[in-house]
Amino acid sequence: MERIKELRNLMSQSRTREILTKTTVDHMAIIKKYTSGRQEKNPSLRMKWMMAMKYPITADKRITEMIPERNEQGQTLWSKMSDAGSDRVMVSPLAVTWWNRNGPMTSTVHYPKIYKTYFEKVERLKHGTFGPVHFRNQVKIRRRVDINPGHADLSAKEAQDVIMEVVFPNEVGARILTSESQLTITKEKKEELQDCKISPLMVAYMLERELVRKTRFLPVAGGTSSVYIEVLHLTQGTCWEQMYTPGGEVRNDDVDQSLIIAARNIVRRAAVSADPLASLLEMCHSTQIGGTRMVDILRQNPTEEQAVDICKAAMGLRISSSFSFGGFTFKRTSGSSVKREEEVLTGNLQTLKIRVHEGYEEFTMVGKRATAILRKATRRLIQLIVSGRDEQSIAEAIIVAMVFSQEDCMIKAVRGDLNFVNRANQRLNPMHQLLRHFQKDAKVLFQNWGIEHIDNVMGMIGVLPDMTPSTEMSMRGLRVSKMGVDEYSRAERVVVSIDRFLRVRDQRGNVLLSPEEVSETQGTEKLTITYSSSMMWEINGPESVLVNTYQWIIRNWETVKIQWSQNPTMLYNKMEFEPFQSLVPKAIRGQYSGFVRTLFQQMRDVLGTFDTTQIIKLLPFAAAPPKQSRMQFSSLTVNVRGSGMRILVRGNSPVFNYNKTTKRLTILGKDAGTLTEDPDEGTSGVESAVLRGFLILGKEDRRYGPALSINELSNLAKGEKANVLIGQGDVVLVMKRKRDSSILTDSQTATKRIRMAIN
């Protein structure tokens, strides 16, 4: 109040008022500030001042022939004076209005195509809904976000080549369009832009917006997909937020979202297979997202998420050098440590072997709903400053930091045994054991941590063991802050290595990622994900496994048939039969397998007992490690639809139904495909027709190599002999005829000869 009185006093003296209002601004520093350099120091003032002049715009001289001197109201549109320092004329803002109303019209057909991203943005805003404005403290953290909705994911170089090819097709310069997306886009754009009158430079700018992902490091509280970022200025201020639902989705956001879901599913599935790394690669290479190969998306898409990064590491791509623990991304901002194995005792006297980080380090921790700054020494948390959306999120961050600190009081807070396992039923490593334990219940941990008196610091507050805020006391070293912690902006990518259990390490051997870090969150993908790999059959449940297994056998029947008779063990070990095993009751798997393998061996030994339908039906059961027993089965059980269902060894059942007349196979009422050869007529039709031009010499002769399928016969030279597998699973020796004249009689004699050769 005193100060205000003083000021009022001063202003009442006329001399003060005069000095403040009349003094000229001739101070050197001020003049320097506003006149040095080309950069405009006060653009808005400059603009207002310019527009207050009569002719603030300059235009090409030709404009005087295209625009009248005065408009309908008699106002002058351009000055006869030339612009100083150029041969342009001075023009009034009214001239622009005249031009917009009365100037020449041009074809507008190309505008929506060129300015596609703008037109789409208008549509999204038109159909978007803005909700109420809420006033509350905004915890914003800077994140790297995509600011450009509706783009393809080309690299800058790829996009440059496409733009040059589209806009300046005749310019010299090496342009190699290699990727599928480059070629598709180029073709599409060339067609769209025929006879386009818009300036090539503008077209190039707009194409760049459409082809390349542009990211900025912006303060965000809330949605980070590009359709939210484009309205960031409308949805969140320093102390307010406005609810908003976008009026449309864009493919780039959908790709990011679907990629994360596919990667999570694949990592989770690979982790439980016999060779996780090989399985992961096989699945990444055989999966498509929205019709694009997943490996192509991984190469181009900068999304950083644990599962996505594991897939990238497996493909030999560089990933971010930060590491993940408990769902938080840790980035070391200063300090260093060495690692040493140490044995520690839990509160339950269980011994744990942990890798202790010795040394002082500082980290930023960034999670989905909370962020923190952590300072720690060897097995000691010095300080943790957390901010988060709510109490729950803050607690999550605190637990992760306490476990990460490896403090003794945390390890002593363990009650009961630690025996958490991963999806493959392997014990988790000690750090994840501790994490899981306290994520389930952190009460003892918080109670045992210790409490301290705190100083009053602006924007900081203490937190008690029951997670209530306090200004006097806090758990030792812990503070809650109103301000968020920014994500690490330097997006440096490093070379990493990955072991067969999908643990990703940097070049110093620090573990950055492991399957334990992959989120269990399930979501529904926006784009169709097509997993061609048999390992992903089970993602849609047991029925899908059943249908897919039989479809696979039918599709590959030609090769399966040969392997069945020549090299059954190799066939039984095929990974396509792996998912099926989860449907067969564990206790009886071995017996079923032994029974089916014996049955198949009898079929191979006793000529003429080959039965296609039965082989297809029972084959998946033979894949389990067999147990020798004298047990016979008339039906085999599979667990689908929540209960055991029976597949009859001889004959049809609701699970496996083969229709002889239509040759269609239905599994649980679902169509599983058509068998191309008839299991019953075998010799009479197909073979006699196909064996025209071949002479049947007799029984199989091993000297002529493994049996060929009928399709492979066409490769034989005239006079060449080979073993061939015919419909009933029998193998006969044939020779390709030297003359074509006798082909007609072959089909009649073939049938007789086959019977003789067999019997």
From Swiss-Prot:
SUPFAM superfamilies attached to this UniProt entry: PB2 C-terminal domain-like (SSF160453)
Family indicated by similarity: Belongs to the influenza viruses PB2 family.
Chain span(s) of sequence motif Nuclear localization signal: 736-739
Encoding gene, per UniProt annotation: PB2
GO biological process entries: 7-methylguanosine mRNA capping; cap snatching; DNA-templated transcription; symbiont-mediated suppression of host cytoplasmic pattern recognition receptor signaling pathway via inhibition of MAVS activity; symbiont-mediated suppression of host gene expression; symbiont-mediated suppression of host mRNA transcription via inhibition of RNA polymerase II activity; viral RNA genome replication
Assembly: Influenza RNA polymerase is composed of three subunits: PB1, PB2 and PA. Interacts (via N-terminus) with PB1 (via C-terminus). Interacts with nucleoprotein NP (via N-terminus). Interacts (via N-terminus) with host MAVS (via N-terminus); this interaction inhibits host innate immune response.
Site annotation Mammalian adaptation: residues: 627
Subcellular localization, as worded in the UniProt entry: Virion; Host nucleus; Host mitochondrion
Protein name: Polymerase basic protein 2
Superkingdom of the organism of origin: Viruses
Predominant location category: virion
Purpose: Plays an essential role in transcription initiation and cap-stealing mechanism, in which cellular capped pre-mRNAs are used to generate primers for viral transcription. Recognizes and binds the 7-methylguanosine-containing cap of the target pre-RNA which is subsequently cleaved after 10-13 nucleotides by the viral protein PA. Plays a role in the initiation of the viral genome replication and modulates the activity of the ribonucleoprotein (RNP) complex.
